[in-house]
């Protein structure tokens, strides 16, 4: 566990989506602030992680804000989506070993071995490494979306898209999006 610092400490190297325990189980690419330790994680995974972004941390008059950009294709929300209920289940790089519990058309119900989280993961997101079944970054979170909002398209997965909205990764039905 990192110590608490008297002055703000800004660090990178590990993309923020690997800190899903600090973001309520969500995979995020925006900067994270641990106020207790006075730490700022700013690595959005740009050019290292598919769906990453370039983050800027802005300090002004003792207050911090952030901004970011990515080079992903975008879409406009044409049908609203309600936020998924409950704690999101996610798999990320440092906790990528999974156990396949059941299979159905195109996806498997998996348990993330390090966290116990269970979620359906598309078969194309699973791989074998050193004899273990693993998964690329994925989540079952569905962010709240309003008509007219813009989202980044991380990956099209048949009837669903893995998107990024305001720096948060999530799922959205393809039919709810107008691709630009």
Question: Where are the language model's segments positioned?
Answer:
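Feature recognizes metal-dependent phosphohydrolase scaffolds
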Residues: 1-180
